[in-house]
């Protein structure tokens, strides 16, 4: 299974934040074992995009303070191809989860610009919301009603 997530870099904490992105808005808040999720206006998802946050299809670790596991990280536009061809990002996120030294925020920004944003710019994408697929995690998945 995989989940659609929006990526946001938080330079204040030097962490990479992954936020769940729902495929459609149902007009009602979704809550889980960690409480209600923030409203779209306070999330990484622009309010005018129409996306909402949802627990559906997300692994338990997605809501951990240490961040989600990331064994596979792909562009939603190219589901069949891993964004990180050299398997760099999963190792970086795993090191951060363990509290080990990893890429700096500047290095991560450069990584995403080179590996992700460049592809979208070349494809002429107008929507700048970056949606990724996080998968390969061994944790259990939520299935919201």
Swiss-Prot record:
Purpose: Multifunctional protein that plays a role in silencing host antiviral defenses and promoting viral transcription. Does not seem to be essential for HBV infection. May be directly involved in development of cirrhosis and liver cancer (hepatocellular carcinoma). Most of cytosolic activities involve modulation of cytosolic calcium. The effect on apoptosis is controversial depending on the cell types in which the studies have been conducted. May induce apoptosis by localizing in mitochondria and causing loss of mitochondrial membrane potential.
Gene designation per UniProt: X
GO cellular component terms, A-Z: host cell mitochondrion; host cell nucleus
Transcription regulation keyword on record: yes
Annotated segments matching region Mitochondrial targeting sequence: 68-117
This protein's UniProt keywords: Activation of host NF-kappa-B by virus, Activator, Apoptosis, Host cytoplasm, Host G2/M cell cycle arrest by virus, Host mitochondrion, Host nucleus, Host-virus interaction, Modulation of host cell cycle by virus, Transcription, Transcription regulation
UniProt organism field: Hepatitis B virus genotype C subtype ad (isolate Japan/S-179/1988)
GO terms for biological process, alphabetical: DNA-templated transcription; symbiont-mediated activation of host NF-kappaB cascade; symbiont-mediated arrest of host cell cycle during G2/M transition; viral genome replication
Subunit and interaction comment: May form homodimer. May interact with host CEBPA, CFLAR, CREB1, DDB1, E4F1, HBXIP, HSPD1/HSP60, NFKBIA, POLR2E and SMAD4. Interacts with host SMC5-SMC6 complex and induces its degradation. Interacts with host TRPC4AP; leading to prevent ubiquitination of TRPC4AP. Interacts with host PLSCR1; this interaction promotes ubiquitination and degradation of HBx and impairs HBx-mediated cell proliferation.
Keyword check for Glycoprotein: no
Protein's name in the database: Protein X
Compartments in which it is found: Host cytoplasm; Host nucleus; Host mitochondrion
UniProt record similarity statement: Belongs to the orthohepadnavirus protein X family.
InterPro entries in the cross-refs: Transactivation_prot_X
Modified how: A fraction may be phosphorylated in insect cells and HepG2 cells, a human hepatoblastoma cell line. Phosphorylated in vitro by host protein kinase C or mitogen-activated protein kinase. N-acetylated in insect cells.
């Amino acid at each position: 299974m995989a989940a659609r997530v929006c990526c946001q870099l938080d330079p204040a904490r030097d962490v990479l934040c992954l936020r769940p992105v729902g495929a459609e808005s149902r007009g009602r808040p979704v809550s889980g074992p960690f409480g209600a999720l923030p409203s779209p206006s306070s999330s990484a998802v622009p309010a005018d995009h129409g996306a909402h946050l949802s627990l559906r299809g997300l692994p338990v670790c997605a809501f951990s303070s240490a961040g989600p596991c990331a064994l596979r990280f792909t562009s939603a536009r190219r589901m069949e191809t891993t964004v990180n061809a050299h398997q760099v990002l999963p190792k970086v996120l795993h090191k951060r989860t363990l509290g080990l030294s990893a890429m700096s925020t500047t290095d991560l920004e450069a990584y995403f610009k080179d590996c992700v944003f460049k592809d979208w710019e070349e494809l002429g994408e107008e929507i700048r919301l970056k949606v990724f697929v996080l998968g390969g995690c061994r944790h259990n998945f939520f299935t919201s009603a």
